[in-house]
Amino acid sequence: MNEEEKYLFDLRGYLSIENALSECQIRNLNNIWDKHIQDQCAMHETTHRFGQLLGWGQAYVDLIDNPSITPYLEVIIGKQFRLDHIYADLIRAGTSPIGAKLHGGGTPFDPCQFYQFHNGKMFNGLTVVAYNLADVGPEDGGFGCVPGSHKSNVDFPAEWKDMAEVMHPCISKVFGPAGTAVIFTEALTHGALPWTGDGERRTIFFKYSPNSISWSPTYFDENNFKGLTENQRSILEPPNARPPNRKTRPKRESD
């Protein structure tokens, strides 16, 4: 993460990284997704949220520590970040699975979703990596946010939140070709603009937290997944302080 990128993330609360996925990765991820659409998504559904992605195959497991993204997370969150939760959203037309309302923001303070900057270093709570598996054009809809709102000291006006019919001028559209990753802090006021593109919007969301924090009420069990690297197992740990002299991984009190 270079100095220009640090400046932009501090200024706006997000970065857009093109080519975060290779053409081969995009193809493999989409091929797997197609199979799950057939199994889980009815033809008439305009939107659908998929979970349990780490069970979809190695192509999804590899995103745990994507080398194109990890260096950014190490600066934005810290070297001992953990995977908090993941899902994938399909939108064929209209609003997302959770609608078109903006959420998040610097105020009121949320100990799980925050942005701070001290002594030349940024500190973030829950942080999102959103991968485009299909092209998103400037007029298609998709990710929208209020740049700089992660540092706001005033509540976002309630009457500006709903983007279903009108988009307030303070909201920016963030778009990019397939393979683009948008990295943003959950302290940023953001949401999904109604989808009007010709094809489907396919977005994978990998959400990370500092090692000692959890936003999600559930944790990954690293033992449920085969073939994980040692680094991936570490990223799937439940929240804990990770003292440097520990002799074992976290375990339940009854173990």
Language model: regions and residue ranges:
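Double-stranded beta-helix
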Residues: F123-L126, D135-L193, I213
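Short acidic/polar capping segments at secondary-structure boundaries
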Residues: A88-T95, G106-T107, N132-P138, S149-S152
